[in-house]
Amino acid sequence: MERKHMNVASFNLDHNAVKAPYVRLADKKIGSHGDVIYKYDIRVCQPNREQMLMPALHSLEHLLAELMRNHSDKILDISPMGCQTGFYISLLNEPDYQVMLHLLETTLNDILAAEAVPACCEEQCGFAANHSLSGAQEIARYLLAHRNKWEQVF
């Protein structure tokens, strides 16, 4: 049976066929003034088989959001997936996939050196008690150890 095409690009991806971890261009949108948004799927865990624990995922989100912007002003958004298997990272007007890979690798190394989770307090975070720096660093270490797999999605 053929599946209906969905409006959300990731819903059209066969989640059983992918091999995490990987980094793939998930979507590209061209604005009315010519700006282009590149949305990347940063998949950490194998869909429907494993997921990141929430405190580690939450801290990794904060660390990526803060530290990646030290390396590029083209970062629009970093969003965790509800399924807890990865993140979406959106870049503005940066078409080079290798630049995205370098940004991620550099930022993951920054995370390994981090001594605290940024904005990990009730004033700056909606669930400040739900963080794990060591958990985020474990995920960063895992991704860096599997760097050679990032470019192969299937």
UniProtKB/Swiss-Prot annotation:
GO terms for biological process: quorum sensing. Fe cation binds at H58, H62, C125. The keyword Metal-binding applies. Keywords: Autoinducer synthesis, Iron, Lyase, Metal-binding, Quorum sensing. Binds 1 Fe cation per subunit. InterPro entries: LuxS_sf, Metalloenz_LuxS/M16, S-ribosylhomocysteinase. It catalyses: S-(5-deoxy-D-ribos-5-yl)-L-homocysteine = (S)-4,5-dihydroxypentane-2,3-dione + L-homocysteine. GO terms for molecular function: iron ion binding; S-ribosylhomocysteine lyase activity. Its EC number is 4.4.1.21. Its cofactor is Fe cation. Signal peptide: none annotated. Homodimer. Involved in the synthesis of autoinducer 2 (AI-2) which is secreted by bacteria and is used to communicate both the cell density and the metabolic potential of the environment. The regulation of gene expression in response to changes in cell density is called quorum sensing. Catalyzes the transformation of S-ribosylhomocysteine (RHC) to homocysteine (HC) and 4,5-dihydroxy-2,3-pentadione (DPD). Belongs to the LuxS family. This is S-ribosylhomocysteine lyase. It comes from Dichelobacter nodosus (strain VCS1703A). The gene is luxS.
